[in-house]
């Protein structure tokens, strides 16, 4: 194996190969990380400077050590926030995604009530209302045009659901303005956008031109203006808040929360609902369309359950096959495809020394394809999550993270995914437009290089 040395010395990527790998990480990080793992193994160091260590790990045992066993030593850290290639820190601020230590503990304690069973179930009427609107729209559309751009529709619907359930169900939001600013901000933070910026800056520098990338700031300014207006209205009690904004207002009145805190949590919730859940639903619907036998089996599962328990609401039913499908979708296309941590103190992982201040990178995309745990890891196979097959793979599967900092909104996301996928399947048969497997991009979220389009046939 290239770069292999003493088993307890972390393989170091040769200096002459660093530029190639660095460009690869900016241009196509999923492919680049996979290639480096093939060459250097499950742990290796991309050392860009004398005192810097960017250590990639790709084994469940190492991941468990970082995210659970010694998680106190591995926080996001200032270095991770400041060097984030996606520039998320100015977007998400110090909200639940980016905070650390005692600050994170306090936020988690404040927000976890939003994800209790009671709180989650209280969002059902709004989920059903927005889903009903989408189904009605599609039912009319498919009469003349059966092709639907699923991703955009899911993004719009999830944004509506989030704003109504977590901000207010009384406001008439300017959904288009919020949607355009969010999509623009996310795209401007993509690795491809950053690569284009770096290339242009490098080209113009010899001409004495100091090129600065400002497009993301324009979108962020729009989002900040929207957030500021919403926060002002909340504090002045101009509308009845729901979910997140209700608990933030209560905390604000106790002088425990600032305007900035409310703004940051708003951005965190919008991002999570807007992109991660919507994208996960998109890929789930794609897999149903791409594998018609599985779609038929899931439909039969739904029909049988409804027939046996006609008085039980669909949100309270168990659908084992659908759950296998969703889990396999999240394995292949984990919305958050990488995690970064900073080692506060020096440590040892399976005998490998980890210097203090090292940046640790975990790619869930690569981990979910580790050949030791996922044979034929690029192939779609819902049997991967049958009880016997999944045994011992807890830390080989981390679409929501793992350990103490596992995504606080996991239960809500899974609840929304099941209800929405079930609702769509009851009304439409799904078919792919092309038999070719979609190519993917790792921006902030894993998406297709082209929009995911499906053919819908009304049942």
Report the location of each language-model feature.
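N-terminal membrane-proximal hinge/A-helix region immediately C-terminal to the signal-anchor transmembrane segment
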Residues: 1-89, 102, 106, 121-122, ...
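Cytochrome P450 heme-thiolate monooxygenase catalytic core
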Residues: 1-10, 74-85, 103, 119-279, ...
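Cytochrome P450 proximal C-terminal region
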Residues: 2-6, 10, 37-38, 131, ...
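Short, conserved phosphate/pyrophosphate- and ester-handling motifs at nucleotide-, phospho-/glycolipid
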Residues: 59, 273, 357
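Cytochrome P450 catalytic-core helices
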Residues: 276-295, 299-301, 411-426
């Amino acid at each position: 194996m290239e770069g292999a040395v003493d088993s307890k010395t972390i393989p170091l990527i040769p200096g002459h190969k660093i530029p190639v790998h660095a460009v690869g990480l900016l241009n196509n990080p999923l492919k680049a990380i996979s290639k480096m793992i093939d060459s250097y193994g499950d742990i290796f160091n991309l050392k860009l400077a004398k005192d810097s260590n960017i250590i990639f790990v790709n084994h469940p045992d190492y991941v468990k050590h970082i995210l659970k066993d010694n998680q106190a030593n591995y926080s996001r850290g200032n270095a991770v926030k400041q060097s984030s290639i996606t520039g998320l820190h100015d977007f998400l601020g110090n909200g639940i995604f980016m905070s650390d230590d005692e600050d994170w503990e306090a936020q988690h304690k404040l927000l976890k009530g939003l994800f209790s069973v009671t709180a989650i179930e209280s969002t059902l009427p709004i989920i059903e209302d927005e889903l009903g609107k989408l189904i009605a729209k599609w039912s009319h559309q498919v009469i003349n045009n059966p092709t639907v751009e699923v991703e955009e529709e899911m993004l719009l619907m999830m944004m509506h659901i989030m704003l109504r359930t977590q901000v207010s169900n009384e406001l008439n939001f300017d959904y288009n303005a919020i949607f355009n600013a969010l999509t623009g901000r996310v795209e401007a933070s993509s690795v491809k956008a950053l690569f284009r910026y770096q290339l242009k800056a490098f080209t113009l520098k010899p001409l004495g031109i100091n090129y600065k990338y400002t497009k993301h700031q324009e979108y962020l300014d729009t989002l900040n203006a929207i957030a500021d207006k919403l926060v002002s209205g909340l504090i002045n009690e101009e509308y009845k808040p729901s979910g997140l904004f209700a608990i933030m207002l209560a905390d604000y009145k106790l002088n425990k929360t600032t305007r900035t805190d409310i703004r940051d949590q708003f951005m965190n919730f919008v991002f999570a609902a807007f992109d991660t859940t919507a994208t996960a639903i998109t890929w789930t619907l794609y897999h149903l369309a791409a594998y018609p036998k599985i779609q038929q089996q899931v439909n039969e599962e739904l029909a049988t359950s409804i027939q046996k328990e006609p008085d039980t609401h669909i949100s309270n039913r168990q659908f084992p096959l659908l759950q296998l499908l969703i889990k396999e979708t999240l394995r292949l296309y984990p919305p958050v495809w990488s995690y970064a941590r900073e080692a506060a103190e020096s440590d040892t992982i399976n005998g490998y020394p980890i210097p203090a201040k090292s940046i640790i990178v975990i790619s869930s995309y690569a981990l979910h394809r580790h050949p030791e745990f996922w044979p034929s890891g690029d192939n779609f196979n819902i049997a991967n999550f049958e009880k016997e097959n999944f045994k011992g793979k807890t830390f080989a599967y981390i679409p929501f993270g793992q350990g103490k900092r596992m995504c606080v909104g996991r239960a809500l996301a899974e609840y929304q995914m099941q209800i929405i996928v079930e609702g769509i399947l009851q009304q439409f048969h799904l078919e792919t437009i092309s038999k070719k497997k979609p190519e993917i991009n790792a921006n902030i979220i894993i998406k297709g290089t082209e929009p995911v389009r499906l053919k819908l046939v009304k049942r």
